[in-house]
């Protein structure tokens, strides 16, 4: 099933992320959420808003350069992954992602299509973000 949520601005993105964070309580962890969309579509903004809704108060930055950031929220550990710069399956393996899944509440994965050969866990949900008129 595909559902569309028109998001007019960052506030609407934050509201959707907050709603999604609230729904996590009814689901079995760990959950893997793939965030897809072009550069500037709002993937990191959505991840930041979701982390805020889960109680993260510290800085939330795009993990583009470090590839992976972990946050201990009131709901549990959230792993935010950005695979944009990944070039090979070996780089993905070197991240040791399997070590991060146990005990996690949620994985937020930006650019999952760069996960090379199915080394990423299958998503429980996918969110496709698009800029209207782009």
Each PLM stretch: what is its role?
Residues 43:
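Conserved lysine of the Walker
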Residues 56-71:
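Short beta-strand-centered segment that lines the nucleotide-binding/catalytic pocket of NTP-utilizing
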Residues 1-20:
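N-terminal pre-Walker A segment at the start of P-loop NTPase domains
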Residues 23-30:
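Phosphate-binding P-loop
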Residues 3-4, 52, 87-134:
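Short phosphate-coordinating micro-motif centered on Lys-Gly-acidic
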Residues 33-35:
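Hydrophobic anchor at the beta1->P-loop junction of P-loop NTPases
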Residues 39:
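The conserved Walker
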